[in-house]
């Protein structure tokens, strides 16, 4: 079975270090959650069949627990824990003994059984201030000064109004002044933890999407969907949170006015790629980070999800940072090095960070921006529009990636344009 080590994608830097060492891509044995699994059911099952399957699982699990063989494993298990339903994809998490796992693997209703996994956050440190990223988004990829605070960012003044950006991350400081009351708490999957951002990553990502100063879509709403805390998570929580997001978008009739940002990455893990793909088929757009391993993104999840918008990082002078993943599955490049945004620790706190965690929300913000000014009826239309606006052949060392950088199209629009300084 393939294992996955997820991490949030901001990189550790020291001054002058532009080639940091990435976190390990593959998980070690200690990363597996003992006795805990993610089970994916086959498609086409009826509600009655799923109910019967759950009853069967409970019965088999109880019988195995009562046997000597199950007790000898030394792992206390609790059976089915949570169920996830994304479009027509049905999955559940559970704590099972080895015998029950064997029984599940042979069950005709089961597509796959994968061990659950701890998910780790990448370390971050504060950097000098920089504002080049926004100016880059409206400059057709023209190189911009790294440390300038007078870079123009031109945009339509609808600026994401009426659109909802869902940030699956460490939470968001919804009281930060950058959000002007447009950020709300949605779902917290972490038990016995408050729905606050103690790590900073989620607030940072949300600021790039929709902050009044640092955001691409300055009037968009942002929803905090907390699947990480201060250092680790598991698929049990990530899938629960992603499931909640898809349901909330669907129930709120926001499919054409919502985008999900996933600034996370790890080794290829099919169950989560399947979840992202099913959300796409349900009419929901997901933007994901390419990953920080300096390798081909085809080996990463969710970067390898075929219909996610996968984002690599580009520097201010149109070069690929050595950390950014690349490859044919990278759809687009966006600013991802020395990007300033909101941070933890106060309602006006900021930090400057690097990584594909910063690149992805630039494009998620662009999606929100375009949704507010154009009629984009489906994820396919969203992706086509974003890619149609890109500027080609600018990124140096893009390797075999599609070479196109993000652009908001403003120079082709006939509006009175506000400017950001």
Curated annotation (Swiss-Prot):
Q: Where is the Peptidase S8 domain?
A: 131-421
Where does the Inhibitor I9 domain lie? 36-122
GO biological process per UniProt: proteolysis
Name it: Subtilisin-like protease 2
Q: Which gene encodes it?
A: SUB2
Which sites are catalytic?
169, 201, 357
Q: Which PANTHER family match?
A: ALKALINE PROTEASE 1-RELATED (PTHR43806:SF58), PEPTIDASE S8 (PTHR43806)
Per the entry, what this protein does is: Secreted subtilisin-like serine protease with keratinolytic activity that contributes to pathogenicity.
Propeptide part(s) removed at maturation, as residue ranges: 17-122
Molecular functions (GO terms): serine-type endopeptidase activity
Per the UniProt record, the source organism is Trichophyton verrucosum (strain HKI 0517)
Span of the signal peptide = 1-16
User: Any one cellular component term from GO for this entry?
Assistant: extracellular region
Chief place of localization: secreted
Locations listed in the record: Secreted
Look up the domain of life of the source.
Answer: Eukaryota
User: Known InterPro entries for this protein?
Assistant: PCSK9_ProteinaseK-like (IPR034193), Peptidase_S8/S53_dom (IPR000209), Peptidase_S8/S53_dom_sf (IPR036852), Peptidase_S8_Asp-AS (IPR023827), Peptidase_S8_His-AS (IPR022398), Peptidase_S8_Ser-AS (IPR023828), Peptidase_S8_subtilisin-like (IPR050131), Peptidase_S8_subtilisin-rel (IPR015500)
Question: Keywords assigned by UniProt?
Answer: Glycoprotein, Hydrolase, Protease, Secreted, Serine protease, Signal, Virulence, Zymogen
The EC designation for this entry is 3.4.21.-
In Pfam terms, one family for this protein is Inhibitor_I9
**Which residues are modified by glycosylation?**
248, 261, 348, 388
Give the similarity note: Belongs to the peptidase S8 family.
């Amino acid at each position: 079975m393939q294992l996955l080590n997820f991490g949030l994608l901001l990189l550790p830097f020291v001054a002058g270090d532009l080639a940091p060492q990435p976190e390990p891509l593959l998980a070690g044995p200690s990363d597996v959650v003992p006795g805990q699994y993610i089970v994916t059911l086959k498609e086409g099952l009826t509600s009655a069949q799923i109910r019967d399957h759950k009853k069967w699982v409970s019965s088999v699990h109880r019988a195995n627990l009562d046997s000597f063989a199950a007790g000898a494993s030394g792992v206390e298990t609790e059976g089915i824990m949570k169920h996830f339903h994304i479009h027509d994809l049905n999955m559940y998490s559970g704590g099972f003994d080895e015998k029950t796992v064997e029984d599940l693997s042979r069950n005709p209703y089961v597509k796959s059984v994968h061990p659950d996994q701890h998910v780790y956050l990448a370390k971050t440190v504060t950097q000098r201030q920089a504002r080049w990223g926004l100016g880059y988004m409206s400059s057709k990829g023209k190189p911009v000064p790294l440390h300038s605070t007078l870079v123009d960012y031109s945009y339509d003044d609808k600026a994401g109004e009426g659109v909802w950006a869902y940030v699956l991350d460490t939470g968001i400081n919804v009281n930060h002044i950058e959000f002007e009351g447009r950020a709300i708490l949605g779902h917290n999957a972490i038990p016995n933890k408050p729905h606050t951002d103690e790590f900073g990553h989620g607030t940072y990502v949300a600021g790039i999407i929709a902050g009044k100063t640092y955001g691409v879509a300055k009037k968009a709403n942002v929803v905090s969907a907390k699947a990480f805390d201060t250092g680790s998570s598991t698929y049990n929580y990530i899938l629960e949170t992603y499931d909640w997001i898809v349901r909330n978008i669907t129930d709120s009739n926001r499919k054409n006015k919502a985008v999900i940002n996933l600034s996370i990455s790890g080794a290829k893990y099919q169950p989560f790629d399947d979840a992202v793909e099913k959300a796409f088929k349900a009419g929901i757009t997901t933007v994901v980070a390419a990953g920080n391993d300096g390798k081909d993104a085809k080996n990463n999840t969710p970067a390898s999800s075929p219909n996610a918008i996968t984002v690599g990082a580009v520097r201010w002078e149109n070069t690929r940072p050595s950390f950014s993943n690349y490859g044919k599955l990278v759809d687009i490049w966006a600013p991802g090095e020395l990007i300033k945004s909101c941070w933890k620790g106060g309602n006006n706190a900021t930090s400057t960070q690097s990584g594909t965690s910063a690149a992805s929300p630039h494009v998620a913000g662009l999606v929100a921006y375009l949704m507010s000014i154009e009629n984009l009826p489906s994820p396919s239309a969203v992706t086509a529009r974003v890619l149609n606006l890109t500027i080609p052949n600018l990124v140096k060392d893009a390797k075999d990636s599609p070479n196109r950088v993000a652009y908001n199209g403003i120079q082709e629009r006939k509006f009175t344009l506000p400017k950001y300084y």
